[in-house]
């Protein structure tokens, strides 16, 4: 029997927005259709946070940051939060907190998104996107790096 592989409690958040409209891309989770969020994911063993951010963007919304010569912005912000109780089974026993690094990805324009891990996507004005997410860290990242940066 294989040992269970647990998620690392180290993750990234990538707020994707369109430079021309300042609207934010929000993704509807499969495991909780009432939960909308930006791109998120775990940092894998041996991977840096920026590498994880680029990988997750490519996996979740099929945008290749390198091939498209886009600039992934490291917000230089890391937060720690309590892992939702219904998600703790994914982590090693006793792990209750996660450390998340924030990034932004500015696309020139809104585009059709090919999503692979979510039910749907929406482009929303930044205040509406911030209000939609259940994640305080996602809300704060949108407010700080899209709304207040405008």
UniProtKB/Swiss-Prot annotation:
Keywords: Folate biosynthesis, Hydrolase, Magnesium, Metal-binding. Its cofactor is Mg(2+). GO terms for biological process: folic acid biosynthetic process; tetrahydrofolate biosynthetic process. It catalyses: 7,8-dihydroneopterin 3'-triphosphate + H2O = 7,8-dihydroneopterin 3'-phosphate + diphosphate + H(+). It is an enzyme of class 3 (hydrolase). One of its GO terms (molecular function) is magnesium ion binding. A motif (Nudix box) lies at residues 41-62. Residues 5-146 form the Nudix hydrolase domain. Substrate binds at residues 7, 29, 40, 81-84, 135. Subject to product inhibition by pyrophosphate. Optimum pH is 8.5-9. Binds 1 Mg(2+) ion per subunit. Mg(2+) binds at residues 56, 60, 117. Its EC number is 3.6.1.67. It comes from the Bacteria. Catalyzes the hydrolysis of dihydroneopterin triphosphate to dihydroneopterin monophosphate and pyrophosphate. Required for efficient folate biosynthesis. Can also hydrolyze nucleoside triphosphates with a preference for dATP. Belongs to the Nudix hydrolase family. This is Dihydroneopterin triphosphate diphosphatase. The gene is nudB.
